Amino acid sequence: MSIESIADTIKPKSDQLNADDLIAGPITVTITSGRKVADPKQPLILEINGGHKPWKPCLSMRRIMAAIWGDDGRAWIGGCVTLFCDPTVVFGGKEQGGIRISHISGISKSKTVLLTATRGKRLPFTVNPMPQYDAAQFADNLPKWNAAISAGRFSKDDVVYKAQQSGKLTEEQIQQIGA
């Protein structure tokens, strides 16, 4: 067994994506589905690609996504976000760390939203546009990816997930992978 990456050995035991899952670094994911549940603290569960546990975004991150994508959750499906562990997130009066969005699809320039930090105190939170995957790099990598998929070494979803760690793929690029 290779020790190339030990990220899987430090994941917390939980049914959801946690800030501790992101200690090794940020992840860029696509929202594949979502549902509302009867939990007042975490009423939204978003399924994300890449083999990750479901993400239950906090109120502030739900507000960011609503400010950018609107309040119809169906429009969020297919959207991409880069998630990171922010160690300064306060919960219960103490810095506990939490999941924040650094980049989001659907915007062409950085966007700042005022979010409630504590009662009566609002702070700006800025998200950046999702960078696009470099077209020349895509053209160079596509034959290698398709060969790996044909050989059964990777699935199309594996390739898309890994590629989107470098930049958002267009729908046309995604269709070319594994074709």
Where are the predicted features?
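Short nucleic-acid-contacting surface segments enriched for D/E, G, S/T with interspersed K/R
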Residues: 67-82
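Short, contiguous, well-structured surface segments enriched in hydrophobic/aromatic residues
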Residues: 22-67
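Short connector loops at helix/strand junctions that flank enzyme active sites
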Residues: 26, 41, 76-80, 94-96
